[in-house]
Amino acid sequence: MIIGVGTDIVQIPRIEKIIKLYPEIFPKRILNTEELKKFALLKKESHVTFLAKRFAAKEAISKAFGVGIGRGINFKDITLLNDELGKPIVKIDSLYTQKLPPFNIHLSLSDDYPICVAFVVVEKIIL
């Protein structure tokens, strides 16, 4: 059973401008500790796309839960990792989601400059 669907589109040049203005503050605002470690290992030319994808994904995830960022789920509550094949894996540590029945999150990310898009389906696990 589908709990919710969310999508978000990010203009990558918008993220570039924000990073130029706030090169240290912006990543710390949207990435949690685990993601910041991964971010630090990236080549500088990969920073913008990495941040744009995470921004779009986290917005789409919060929309799929019907709350939006800052109203039950925050940027740092969501961790985006990848499996060995590169498939996105989502972990959420939020009081809001702890009240929900067990669920899976299906995330698709795509970027083609100047656009990045995230699409999310949250599915209730039927036991």
UniProtKB/Swiss-Prot annotation:
Family statement drawn from the similarity comment of this UniProt entry? Belongs to the P-Pant transferase superfamily. AcpS family.
Query: What cellular-component terms does GO give this entry?
Result: cytoplasm
Gene3D superfamilies recorded: 4'-phosphopantetheinyl transferase domain
Q: Where does Mg(2+) bind?
A: D8, E59
Which biological processes are named by the entry's GO terms? fatty acid biosynthetic process
Where can this protein be found? Cytoplasm
| E.C. numbers | 2.7.8.7
Q: Which UniProt keywords apply?
A: Cytoplasm, Fatty acid biosynthesis, Fatty acid metabolism, Lipid biosynthesis, Lipid metabolism, Magnesium, Metal-binding, Transferase
* The protein's required cofactors: Mg(2+)
Primary location class: cytoplasm
Protein's job: Transfers the 4'-phosphopantetheine moiety from coenzyme A to a Ser of acyl-carrier-protein.
At the highest ranks, the source species' classification is: Bacteria, Pseudomonadati, Pseudomonadota, Alphaproteobacteria, Rickettsiales
Q: Which reaction does it catalyse?
A: apo-[ACP] + CoA = holo-[ACP] + adenosine 3',5'-bisphosphate + H(+)
Q: Does the keyword Lipid metabolism apply?
A: yes
Broad class of enzyme this protein falls into: transferase
Q: Name one Pfam family in it.
A: ACPS
User: What is this protein's name?
Assistant: Holo-[acyl-carrier-protein] synthase
Can you name one GO molecular function term for this protein? holo-[acyl-carrier-protein] synthase activity
Q: What organism does the UniProt record list as the source?
A: Rickettsia bellii (strain OSU 85-389)
Instruction: State the superkingdom.
Output: Bacteria
